[in-house]
Regions:
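The feature captures the conserved acid-bearing segment of alpha/beta-hydrolase catalytic domains
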Residues: 206-261
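C-terminal catalytic histidine-bearing segment of alpha/beta-hydrolase fold enzymes
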Residues: 258-291
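Primarily recognizes the serine-hydrolase "nucleophile elbow" in alpha/beta-hydrolase
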Residues: 163, 169-225
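Serine-hydrolase catalytic machinery in alpha/beta-hydrolase-like enzymes
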Residues: 76, 83-86, 95-165
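N-terminal signal peptide c-region/cleavage motif recognized by signal peptidases
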Residues: 47-49
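N-terminal cap/lid segment of alpha/beta-hydrolase-fold proteins
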Residues: 53-91
Length: 291
């Protein structure tokens, strides 16, 4: 399970919740392990961030490379926190609702693995989809680097949800993969009910992926989400995703919505390469159960 403590980044002045995976034990044992956090994460707690913020120039380059190649859907420009960012909106003929798709670390809203299959495949099932550009850093940036830009994702998520509500009838669902799920969970932890009121269901794909010796610095928000939640991951996913699956399942059960599920796609890895169809079908089948 995750033990949580809030620590301050001296270089940035930002408080961040640290989630430490621990074994089952009594409360006294769990609390004692808090004392080891400064030893485990000295670089995270004391060092200044390597990146000042989202790499907007890289986002612009990626947008220029993909916009002309978009075959399904329409590129749109959304605005948040003083910056424009790319979205790809695709409309279904008979609309059941809207789906906001958040890609993983360092990618873009038409990424061939996970994102593009979902944003097109769910339209075929009657869902309008909006896939947006999440904040990215330079190539090679790791999970701890991306923690510093989690706040940059919050206004983008909110702007995208506003757009979906304006253009879609029915429920609005967030579908987030990998680092996109970290960013969505950060937003929920920070905004609480103000965030939860904005959407109706949540799909997390490959939740909990980080980097070697870089454990999650924030807990999941799943136990706070009294709405339908789908936790889907690959049987050959990253070790952290697999290891923490029971923790996620317990949190989802605690939240109490009977429509929530945890689904393991047996042969799939983190990016669902060659298993895109199973991913789309699993998500679509679960969404159908929301009717």
């Amino acid at each position: 399970m995750l033990t949580v403590v809030t620590c301050l980044f001296p270089a940035t002045g930002k408080a961040v919740r640290l989630g430490l995976p621990i074994e089952n034990g009594n409360t006294k044992t769990r609390m004692a392990r808090f004392h080891f956090l400064p030893l485990l994460f000295p670089a995270l707690l004391a060092a200044p961030p390597l990146y000042a913020g989202a790499d907007l120039a890289r986002e612009k380059r990626m947008a220029e490379q993909i916009v002309d190649a978009i075959l399904d859907g329409s590129p749109i420009r959304l605005h948040a926190a003083g910056n424009d960012f790319l979205g790809i909106y695709t409309e279904a003929e008979d609309t059941k609702g809207g789906v906001l798709i958040l890609h993983g670390r360092g990618f873009h809203p038409d990424w061939a693995s996970v994102v593009q299959p979902l944003r097109v495949g769910l339209v075929e099932q009657g869902w309008n989809t909006l896939s947006i550009q999440m904040p990215v850093l330079q190539k090679g940036a790791k999970y701890f680097d991306y923690v510093h830009v989690f706040p940059d994702a919050m206004p983008r998520i909110e702007a995208a949800l506003d757009y979906l509500h304006e253009h879609s009838d029915g429920p609005v669902v967030i579908v987030a993969h990998s680092c996109g799920s970290h960013m969505a969970q950060h937003w929920i932890l920070e905004k609480g009910e103000g965030a939860l009121r904005r959407f109706d269901a949540f799909v997390g794909i490959g939740m909990g992926a980080t980097d070697y010796r870089q454990p999650m610095v924030e807990p999941y928000a799943l136990d706070r989400m009294s709405m339908p939640v789908l936790d889907i991951y690959g049987g050959n996913d990253y070790p952290a995703v697999l290891r923490m699956a029971p923790e996620r399942a317990a949190m989802i059960e605690h939240a109490g919505d009977p429509r929530s599920r945890q689904v393991r796609v047996p042969q799939a890895a983190h990016y669902f390469v060659d298993h895109e169809r199973e991913l789309v079908e699993s998500v679509a089948a679960w969404l159908k159960g929301l009717d």
